Amino acid sequence: MQVVAFTGAGISKESGIDTFQDRPGIRDKLTRTFATNHPEEYRKVMKEFCDTIKGKEPNNAHKELARAGVKIITMNVDGLHEKAGSYDVLAIHGRLPEEHELPYCESLRNAPVLYEDKAPRYQDAFDIVYGL
C-alpha cells in the first residue's frame, strides 16, 4: 500500500512558522500584480518571509514522515520536509527565493508560486493521487 501525506501550513506551525491566517494581509502581497506593481515592497516581504523561516527546524511531524519514507505533497515553501530528511516531496507552490535571488525576486516564477500565477506542479500532484 502506498501512502501519500498532504501537508500545509499547519504542519510547520509547531516549528514556529505562522500560517497566513496568523498574518492578516499577507495574501494581498503575494500576488503577481503586487510583485509587478510594487517590486521594492514585494522584495521586502520576501526577505522578511525568508528571514522568518531561516533557522527554523523540522518538528516531530516532519521527522516522522521522513522516518516512515512517506511521499509528501505539500503546499509549504519552507523546505522543512526536505530538511527533516524526506526525499520524495512535491512542493506544489514552489520554493522560497535563494538569498542571491532576493534583489530580483519579483521576476521569479515558482519561487514561490504567487496568487494569479499558474501552479505548474498541480498536475504532478493529480498524477500521484490518480496513481494510488
Regions found by a protein language model. Name each.
Residues 1-132:
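Conserved catalytic core of sirtuin-type NAD+-dependent deacylases
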